[in-house]
Amino acid sequence: MVIYDSSKKEYCSLEPLKNRHIKVYVCGPTVYDDAHLGHARSAIAFDLLRRTLNALGYKTTFMKNFTDIDDKIIKKMNETGKSLQEITSYYIQRYLEDMEALGVQRADIEPKATQNLDAMIDMIERLLQKECAYQTPNGDIYFDTSKDEKYCTLSHKCDEESMSRIEPNPDKKNPADFALWKRCKGEGDVCFDSPFGKGRPGWHIECSAMIDKHLAYHDTPFQIDIHAGGADLLFPHHENEAAQTRCACNQELAKYWMHNGFVTISGEKMSKSLGNSFFIKDALKVYDGEILRFYLLSTHYRSDLNFNEEDLLASKKRLDKLYRLKKRVYGVQASTPQKEFVDELLQALSQDLNISKTLAAIDQFIAYANEHLDNNPKDKAFKKQIVANIEYISKLLGIGHKDAYSYFHLGISEEEKQKIEELIEKRTTAKKEKNFQLADSIREELRSMGIAIMDTPQGTLWEKI
């Protein structure tokens, strides 16, 4: 498999550190609010990576963290009067619900920052002993970036514009130095005991320490195979992670670095701090999770995606075609997927998750299958292979797994379904009584409601247009 390494800025052949086992770490959410479509995009992108690696025969260990202590969480506590545990457990559960709705597989390891303070304190102590960190007069502990000769070689973003994102502090030795431990500020703060005094960890140390504790190899030049996350995390977060690990553990953090593009609205990056978030939960009230997944999946993971309803509906129509084919082979048992088709999909995804080629291959399969069924409606062996191919698509991309008829009823309330069924029953009675004028009138009434009907040997079927 070939992937694009964000640090090297080139395509690399994926060579596991050990055997055919790939260890992947993806930065998870800071749980102070609901997740937005930017979080969904990242989760879906690397879920596709995981599914592809598994399909290619690699064993994977996948880890995603929860940042459950942070300035934003403390601010939320002070605003709401709720405890740290109340806020973080609530938003972790909501995040997991969102991921389930989007078809994102649970990570093998899901550590929380507050449950791994021992690992963070241990890493900070190592950095202090090596004189790669220092304590300021007010008790904060900072990483000394001047002690890492390779600092900025990951992101290549130590220019003036990038450095302007870093909060200035007169107690720091160097402008790029970053907090490892923040001294307790008193009332309203969240504090933990440590050898350095009461306080809490900085954001960057959390990921490095949890990787070192739960996922890392300690006998290889790199701790893990792939570190992944959103492009906005490359600097300073991932740069700082890499520096800490290098200095504390005498290892590089990851052999490969992968970053997904932004989700934008009118060209502006989606983030909660900008106030233009489209929360996943809000989107799920309007669109089914599978449709959202397919839409977010349909643009290559490294490209920015400008969210708009027109593209989403076009994406839905593309997914509709798969389900229409699935309806044509409803009730047929699968045989085995076509080898040439499987190879074509895996070859495309093996090229840095080339989703465009992957979906083109699926479109071609759907078109050919429909044409063959039109000409050979009784070809049972072919129908079985169609079902097998669709099942393989479902396993690989996480789409196409719903009941074909239920899919076309998505977004219809139970009350609306009851009305539709009553009209269809009324139409069936009218046809039996040869009242074709009434039957046609009911068909038009249903069409005006956005419902198309099809008369089949199994009865009248309907779907949302």
Curated annotation (Swiss-Prot):
UniProt-listed Enzyme Commission number(s): 6.1.1.16
Binding site for Zn(2+): C27, C207, H237, E241
Annotated Pfam families: tRNA-synt_1e
UniProt keyword list: Aminoacyl-tRNA synthetase, ATP-binding, Cytoplasm, Ligase, Metal-binding, Nucleotide-binding, Protein biosynthesis, Zinc
Motif 'KMSKS' region location, chain numbering: 269-273
Motif ('HIGH' region): 29-39
Catalytic activity reported: tRNA(Cys) + L-cysteine + ATP = L-cysteinyl-tRNA(Cys) + AMP + diphosphate
Cellular component, GO annotation: cytosol
SUPFAM superfamilies cross-referenced by the UniProt entry: Anticodon-binding domain of a subclass of class I aminoacyl-tRNA synthetases, Nucleotidylyl transferase
GO MF term list: ATP binding; cysteine-tRNA ligase activity; zinc ion binding
Cytoplasm among keywords: yes
Chain positions recorded as ATP binding sites: K272
Swiss-Prot/TrEMBL cofactor(s): Zn(2+)
Highest taxon of the lineage: Bacteria
This protein's record includes keyword Transmembrane: no
Cofactor note as given: Binds 1 zinc ion per subunit.
Location relative to the cell: Cytoplasm
Biological processes per GO annotation: cysteinyl-tRNA aminoacylation
Class in the EC hierarchy, top level: ligase
Subunit relationships: Monomer.
Entry's family note: Belongs to the class-I aminoacyl-tRNA synthetase family.
HAMAP family referenced in this protein's UniProt entry, alphabetically: Cys_tRNA_synth
Name of protein: Cysteine--tRNA ligase
